[in-house]
Amino acid sequence: FPTRRSSDLMLTIKGTRGDRMVLGIPNNNVRKQYYDYLKEMFEEKSPIDTSKLDDCFYDMAYEGKWQEGLTFLAESYAKVSSVRDGIEGERNIQGFFMAYLNLCNYYITAPELELNHGFCDFFLLPNLAHYAVKHSYIIELKVLPKKDFSALCEDRKTTKAEAQWNEAVAQIHRYAEAPRVKALRQDTLLHKIVMQFEGWKLKNIEEVE
């Protein structure tokens, strides 16, 4: 298939998601190389305070305080995107989040993990072999172009943003109910987080009960 960037050459086809291909990184060495490449690319545009990020990761892992860290990542993404010709899209956001979540030693970050016949964007699996982590996370990212965010759906009753949010809530509930989740999260408390973007700006972030 055609590639848009040189980094695409480092990906391989892992499966399908409807009529789309699910791309994955073939092995751990290539994975590290790929996400190091992404991180360097983003750092050239707008460096991130990784010391602050480390503190946020600690709070997520041990205190269950996730909002500051994920909001910080979203705001950092907005700074990068605002100087990158207005590039928008879920794939771009996923790449950014993966590059920086991959810095967190408290978790094994699993992107596009199949759960209940769907694929969650990120599952932060507790790295209990090395850290006494108390909390784990499923994170679902949703993106709408600016022109569509406030537009009405065909029923003329709800906006496209509202419909997308409701879909994300239903999806993340379904992922969390997958039989394998209990084994994956082990004895940690699972948090289900939905993040919704209007273009490159975070508009909504919430823990789904």
Per-region residue spans from a language model:
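Short, small-residue-biased leader/transition segments that mark boundaries at the very start
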Residues: 1-6
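Glycine-centered, phosphate/nucleic-acid-interacting loop/turn motifs that mediate DNA/RNA or nucleotide
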Residues: 9
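Accessory beta->alpha helical hairpin/"wing" motif in late/C-terminal subdomains of nucleic-acid enzymes
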Residues: 12-45
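Generic, low-specificity signal for short hydrophobic/alpha-helical stretches with a mild N-terminal bias
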Residues: 16, 20, 39, 51, ...
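Generic alpha-helical structural element
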Residues: 23, 58, 62, 85-86, ...
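Long, non-coiled-coil amphipathic alpha-helical linker/lever segments
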Residues: 34-70
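Structural signature of nuclease core domains in nucleic-acid processing machines
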Residues: 66-209
